[in-house]
């Protein structure tokens, strides 16, 4: 019984931690678009790494791309 209580408390703590740690998308609700990528290098240029995408997203003006681990690096040249 003690093991089940401990597991339950751990699960509740994880849910609370996750809801507090994840940011709310208030900027997206206001019509402002936030960049959701990390810096990467592609042919000597600094770009934005997009995880789990096969191609660069439209509407950002990317004209150079390099395949990266499980994603793509997109560059505005």
From Swiss-Prot:
GO molecular function, one term: acetylcholine receptor activator activity
Disulfide bonds: 40-73, 42-66, 56-74
Post-translational modification: Toxin occurs in two forms in the mucus, Hmg 1b-2 which is not oxidized and Hmg 1b-2 MetOx which is oxidized at Met-52.
Keywords: Acetylcholine receptor inhibiting toxin, Calcium channel impairing toxin, Cleavage on pair of basic residues, Disulfide bond, Ion channel impairing toxin, Nematocyst, Neurotoxin, Oxidation, Postsynaptic neurotoxin, Potassium channel impairing toxin, Proton-gated sodium channel impairing toxin, Secreted, Signal, Toxin, Voltage-gated calcium channel impairing toxin, Voltage-gated potassium channel impairing toxin, Voltage-gated sodium channel impairing toxin
Residues that make up the propeptide removed upon maturation: 22-34
Segment forming the signal sequence: 1-21
Methionine sulfoxide PTM sites in chain numbering: 52
Subcellular location: Secreted; Nematocyst
Family, similarity comment: Belongs to the sea anemone type 3 (BDS) potassium channel toxin family.
Note: A synonymy between H.magnifica and R.crispa is controversial. The primary structure of this peptide is identical to Hcr 1b-2 from Radianthus crispa (AC C0HL52).
Protein name: Pi/alpha-stichotoxin-Hmg5b
Phylogenetic classification of the source organism: Eukaryota, Metazoa, Cnidaria, Anthozoa, Hexacorallia
